[in-house]
Amino acid sequence: MEPKRIREGYLVKRGSVFNTWKPMWVVLLEDGIEFYKKKSDNSPKGMIPLKGSTLTSPCQDFGKRMFVFKITTTKQQDHFFQAAFLEERDSWVRDTKKAIKCIEGGQKFARKSTRRSIRLPETVDLGALYLSMKDIEKGIKELNLEKDKKIFNHCFTGNCVIDWLVSNKSVRNRQEGLMIASSLLGEGYLQPAGELSKNAADGMAEHPFLDNPDAFYYFPDSGFFCEENSSDDDVILKEEFRGVIIKQGCLLKQGHRRKNWKVRKFILREDPAYLHYYDPAAGGEEPLGAIHLRGCVVTSVESNPDVRKSEEENLFEIITADEVHYFLQAATPKERTEWIKAIQVASRTGK
């Protein structure tokens, strides 16, 4: 049987010979990590066995290069990967550590099911509950919260979740709410944000979920992001960088002159609505370019004459108010839909 694919996506990998950083399509399997030059390639450029390997995160060996983690094999070979943002790195680290642990224990990798361990009643439909929690009018309100000089965008507190469960009559009391919230967390419907909630989720507290105003959580597809809040009042950001970050990640972008496709890291901001793109391998903070989204049109594209038939999937196009065309490619249909929706929302806000 083929090893199960646990997670896949773009990461920047440090070369083992020339020490250069390059974006790769990375696939986490039950027994190893494969990396490809392009997502469409059939054969991997390399494979890292996970048996006996150790993982280090955060890895701060490279100064300003953020969100790096290191995998050291039994042969003492170090492999360095860089994610586009904090939550992406944490997801890779969490799943990779779990895969290594499963190999050690001779178990099959499975997302943690809390239904059995917490004795959750079979009548509780966590999926339906999650959709109710996300309801724009009656659900949990997403906020921008500040703690330890960091701003947590699109999140909410642990006690707000329990308040909502009780007031919505989903549970009879706060203790029962804690049990349900822990199950939602275990099944991936809620994600921890910040040290307090992450430590609890990793088993450092009595319950994985905290009924606490200082414990922050977010919905996995909400566009959550944590950013440093500079206390220096003299720093005046460029107007286009003032907007709140609502989504980020890697996409393929077509060049305007040569029409070739390259992996770029994108950061989407609203009010003012801008989509900045960066060279993920450079590790720098200066964008290669910016797309002003106010009044733009964004649509999915089913074919493009400049793209090979085998690589035509998940394309979309942004046409700015100045009629500049940008062609982008997501990794999956779901990811394309998420980007299109987020850009449409941003394009209608602010300047």
Swiss-Prot record:
The modification Phosphoserine is found at S113, S117. PROSITE patterns: DEP (PS50186), PH_DOMAIN (PS50003). Transmembrane segments: none annotated. Keywords: Acetylation, Phosphoprotein, Repeat. It holds the Pfam family DEP. The modification N6-acetyllysine is found at K64. InterPro entries: DEP_dom, PH-like_dom_sf, PH_domain, Pleckstrin, PLEK_DEP, WH-like_DNA-bd_sf, WH_DNA-bd_sf. One of its GO terms (biological process) is intracellular signal transduction. Residues 4-101, 244-348 form the PH domain. This is Pleckstrin. It comes from Canis lupus familiaris (Dog). The gene is PLEK.
